[in-house]
Amino acid sequence: MLISEGELKLVPYHEISNGQTRDGTQAFHDQEYSYLKSVDSSGDKNSPFYLNSTYIPEQQMPSELNIEQRDASGHVVSLLADEDILEGEAFAQGMGLSSSDFSIQKVGGEFRFLCKGRGHGLGFSQYGGNQLAREGKNWKEILETYFPAMEVAAYEE
């Protein structure tokens, strides 16, 4: 089990990070998730699925689309769509993007979204954890890498 302050907590996972996992307080905008720390997961950059492009026809998009704010790990926190401020994670999910760490480029009559990683980037990276295992780390060392503010404890009834 993974515990923080003597309690079981949410321990999210994702497929591939952008090279660094996200901080829980930045992603959720809530101190309740302060136990989710941003950690290096640069092995994820070796994944063949690290970069993903999605093309969306210009007619399906607002005329103006600009990234307003990113968090410390590079994920889009907010973007301006014409006159509206949109939340980055919700936008990425709604548009079918692989990650909220994306850049926007207008290419011909389309918008190109270049995404780094797959998933929300919080907690455990499946690809990164596998990389650490291949390097000889055991399960406990891997969990301690991705959840440094949490304690690995045995289950007791």
Could you say what each language-model-derived stretch is?
Residues 1-157:
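Conserved, single-site charged/polar hotspot
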